[in-house]
Amino acid sequence: MEQFHATTIVCVRRGNHVALGGDGQVTLGNIVIKGTARKIRRLYHDKVLAGFAGATADAFTLQERFEAKLEKHQGHLMRAAVELTRDWRTDRVLRRLEAMLIVADTEHTLVLTGNGDVLEPEHGLAAIGSGGAYAQSAALALLRNTELPPEAIVKQSLEIAGDLCIYTNQNHVIETLGA
């Protein structure tokens, strides 16, 4: 069976102001299955943002588990992330899931992987998915050379990624925290 390909997710932070955005395209082989998928969510009483890339069903499973860990740890982002990735790495079923998550609150941005990685990226930005490298490059240039707010940087980065990556479209969802 062919793999679902999707997406571009990018997160930009300036201090405690953070924006997380993603495109809406889901592709199966060379066919666009959906152009309006929502891959960005607000979690834990709207205090945490989460975005996912990878196999859609796998990503939803991981996001649900992350949300349960957030509830268990009263919204403590780092503890929830470490516990999720520990489970993800050691559980035989979870280990097969093919997805990545970016999660953020007003203090931290984290990238979570199935290898058990909990990465806090440098430069106040992170990007994942098929268009992630394009979006990250664009965001880094804008972060270094402009005073644009995070949501404007995320928007422009997603536009650039959508122009370059066939698995990324121009239908964006952007959520913010702080200000």
UniProtKB/Swiss-Prot annotation:
Single GO biological process annotation from the record: proteolysis involved in protein catabolic process
The domain of life for this entry's organism is Bacteria
Give the chief site where it resides. Answer: cytoplasm
**Enzyme Commission code(s) on record:** 3.4.25.2
UniProt key word Protease: yes
Q: State the top-level EC class.
A: hydrolase
Where, per UniProt, does this protein localize?
Cytoplasm
What keywords does the record list, in alphabetical order? Answer: Allosteric enzyme, Cytoplasm, Hydrolase, Metal-binding, Protease, Sodium, Threonine protease
Binding positions (Na(+))? 162, 165, 168
Q: Which transformation does this protein catalyse, written as a reaction?
A: ATP-dependent cleavage of peptide bonds with broad specificity
Per the Swiss-Prot or TrEMBL record, the active site comprises: 7
Q: Does the keyword Thylakoid apply?
A: no
UniProt GO molecular function: metal ion binding; threonine-type endopeptidase activity
> For this UniProt entry, what's an example GO CC term?
HslUV protease complex
**Regulation of its function:** Allosterically activated by HslU binding.
Q: Spell out the Pfam families in the cross-references.
A: Proteasome
Subunit structure, as described in the record: A double ring-shaped homohexamer of HslV is capped on each side by a ring-shaped HslU homohexamer. The assembly of the HslU/HslV complex is dependent on binding of ATP.
Regarding protein family, the annotation reads: Belongs to the peptidase T1B family. HslV subfamily.
Q: What does this protein do?
A: Protease subunit of a proteasome-like degradation complex believed to be a general protein degrading machinery.
The protein in question is named ATP-dependent protease subunit HslV
Origin species:
Bordetella parapertussis (strain 12822 / ATCC BAA-587 / NCTC 13253)
